[in-house]
Amino acid sequence: MPDKRALSDSYEQLPLKRAATVSSNTNDISDERIIATLRHPRACVSASGSPFSASPSFQQPVPLCSFSFDEHRKQWHDDRCKRFYRGPPPYNQRHPRQHGARAVFGADLNYGLERFVRRDQDVPEHLDALVAALQHRTEAAVSDEERDQVDQERRKADVVTWRGIITKICTAYEQTAEARFSDPLELNAMMLDDTLYLEEYTCKSARAQKQNKEDDPKMLRMGYYGYSFESYCTVDTELQTREPFRPIPSKESSLPHPAGWSGDVNTNVQWCQVVKTKLGNNRLVIGGEVDAVERNPKTGREELVELKTSMQMTWAQHNPSKAALDQERFEKKLLKFFLQSYLLGIGKIVVGFRDHHGILTTHQDFETLRIPRMVRAGQPIAGRFDHTGKPVIRQQSVWEPKDGLGFGDQILSFIRQTILSRSIQATPTEQISAGAGANTPNPTAAVGQVHHPVYRVTFRSPFDQVEMRCLSEQEIYEEVQDSGGSGARVGFLPRSFYDFVQRRAGS
């Protein structure tokens, strides 16, 4: 049976044309602690060429388990926070700022902003929820035989991480020093039982900068629009998807909530899916948030739906140059949309387009597997026509999925091979010490503390190579283990999960 995850106009699964250069030579590197580098594959080809002849093989994601976070950020190993896609309310509203306009507008995405509850970003979460879900999946089995069978998926995995990290790794190919908004990559990496675990690392100054940006009233409002769109488009039960849109009574006010509003936004609440898949030579177990599900009327199966918002695009008839700029910006944004959904097995993306005032003007459904064709050379450019009225044909691809997936596969293999080559799988020593003085919070002195190597993976401007270095024990304690403030850990993994893995390895 053909792989259902094959891209539209699928690429042949051929070997990579050439591999990116891996080097352990540090002569040209200022930080002597760097132990290995991976050159960006662009260095091997001309500016207009691609280093990859085909996309690496990618297996259709298979669900393993799911879990929920409630409004207090408590994790539950069930689907209580799963949402069902209904779609946005009708476009029959008058615009609050354009009094002479016809009643053809949709939902006001500003609604409920004053009651917006944001998750506390200062609380480090690491991979805790993901590995807890994997541990629970095994321990919930009713027999030893079933536990062994269930745990095989975790033990066979080459990489365990969040979907967002794999997305970031795969979009690394497109990063350039000249880009208006760069997105550097910085990860913590460790091996346990032959499996690579990856988490994102953000230094204190970068966290503060990010928080200040998100606290800016304008940025806060723009970030809120996406969550508001989700509230308008989703409901708690499948039965509610068949109910008509109408104003909802409010407990807090005499005025009802607008039609379609399903509840105030609280970003603590999430429903997450954990899947197994394979990218090139790397077997992955990844977890990520899913916005909603939708019943397929033909198959009867629930299918995953991703919800996004974007600024509406200028009509070409009104301003051709601005329309072309808007189109180009949106097509570049589609790369991240595509990867986020493709990696988790989400087949449908719904994008709500809004105006500058946060009013929904239209929405569009995108089939995930067909997105690469939209930006490929030789295809018509949406909304663009020449003087004869014929569609303008794209001369050059905006992006190619084979490049991002290919470089992503290389980065994962590079990290794994680098750590394995340093014999990191030697059993960590348990330090049984008398304890340190009160004024010396040294992790090496903790009774029963397991010391496990952790590596820092970086890819930053000028984005010409990925670098790896081994963290010191002090860095692990302060930067990875939050100076002991996030509970007992081995590396960045919870000690309870580490002990679980050790028990399973000995079973």
From Swiss-Prot:
Divalent metal cation. One of its GO terms (molecular function) is RNA binding. Its main location: nucleus. It is an enzyme of class 3 (hydrolase). A divalent metal cation binds at E230, D291, E306, L307. One of its GO terms (cellular component) is nucleus. GO terms for biological process: mRNA processing; NAD-cap decapping; nuclear-transcribed mRNA catabolic process. It is found in: Nucleus. Its EC number is 3.6.1.-. The keyword Ribosomal protein does not apply. It catalyses: a 5'-end NAD(+)-phospho-ribonucleoside in mRNA + H2O = a 5'-end phospho-ribonucleoside in mRNA + NAD(+) + H(+); a 5'-end (N(7)-methyl 5'-triphosphoguanosine)-ribonucleoside-ribonucleotide in mRNA + H2O = a (N(7)-methyl 5'-triphosphoguanosine)-nucleoside + a 5'-end phospho-ribonucleoside in mRNA + H(+); a 5'-end triphospho-ribonucleoside in mRNA + H2O = a 5'-end phospho-ribonucleoside in mRNA + diphosphate + H(+). Signal peptide: none annotated. Its cofactor is a divalent metal cation. Substrate binds at R73, C272, E289, K308, Q340. InterPro entries: RAI1 (IPR013961), RAI1-like_fam (IPR039039). Keywords: Hydrolase, Metal-binding, mRNA processing, Nuclease, Nucleotide-binding, Nucleus, RNA-binding. Decapping enzyme for NAD-capped RNAs: specifically hydrolyzes the nicotinamide adenine dinucleotide (NAD) cap from a subset of RNAs by removing the entire NAD moiety from the 5'-end of an NAD-capped RNA. The NAD-cap is present at the 5'-end of some RNAs and snoRNAs. In contrast to the canonical 5'-end N7 methylguanosine (m7G) cap, the NAD cap promotes mRNA decay. Also acts as a non-canonical decapping enzyme that removes the entire cap structure of m7G capped or incompletely capped RNAs. Belongs to the DXO/Dom3Z family. This is Decapping nuclease RAI1. It comes from Mycosarcoma maydis (Corn smut fungus). The gene is RAI1.
